[in-house]
Amino acid sequence: MKQKVTKEKITNHQKAAKTRRQRGYQWEDTIVKRFKKTENWKAFRLGSPSIALPDVLAVNTEKSTIFTIEAKSGTSTSLPVPADQIERCLEWIKTFDIYKNKQVLLAFKFLSKKRIDVGVYENRELREFFKIWDEKLEISDCVCTYNGKIYSKINGV
C-alpha cells in the first residue's frame, strides 16, 4: 500500500512540475511574440531551465538596446526570482558591448486563478508586471507580489 501512495505522490508532483513548465513556456512565448510585433524588435527564447541562460533575449539594433528577461508565471500571491537568475541575466547583457542600452527585465504574470490549496483555486484578475532591475542594487533573491510591489529577500525573509 505504501508503494502505491508513493507512486501517486510522485505522479502528482510530476504533473504539477509539468504544468509549471508549460505556464513558464507560454509566458515566455507571449513575451517573444509581443516584442516581435513591435517595430524593430527581435526576441528569442534562449533555452531550458537546465541551461544557465536568461529566459528571453530581446534586441533593437536601431535603438542599440538589449534586454535579458527573466519570466515568472504562477497562481500564488507572490512570484520569487532567485539571485542567481538575476546575476546570469546581468552577466549576459554585459557581454554585448555593441549595445548602448542594456537592461535586465523581470516579467511577472499572475494567472487569473489563485491557488488556495492543492488543486483548489479561486478566480481573480490576471495581472502582468514588468520591472527593470536596478544594477546599482546588490544582487539578491527578490519577490513580486500580486499588487506589483517588488521586494528584496534577505536571509529568506
Which residues are covered by each model-predicted region?
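Acidic-basic catalytic patches of nuclease active cores, encompassing PD-(D/E)XK
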Residues: 1-47
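Conserved catalytic cores of phosphodiester-cleaving nucleases, focusing on short active-site segments
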Residues: 35, 56-58, 65-75
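A generic beta-sheet turn/junction motif
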Residues: 49, 60-62
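Domain-level recognition of nuclease-like catalytic cores that cleave nucleotide substrates
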Residues: 3, 18, 22, 98, ...
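Alpha-helical scaffolding within the catalytic cores
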Residues: 12, 53-55
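Short, charged, amphipathic alpha-helix that recurs within catalytic cores of restriction-modification
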Residues: 74-106
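Short acidic/glycine-enriched loop/turn segments that link adjacent beta-strands
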Residues: 50-53, 114
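Structural signal for conserved beta-strand scaffold positions within catalytic alpha/beta enzyme cores
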Residues: 45, 70, 106-108
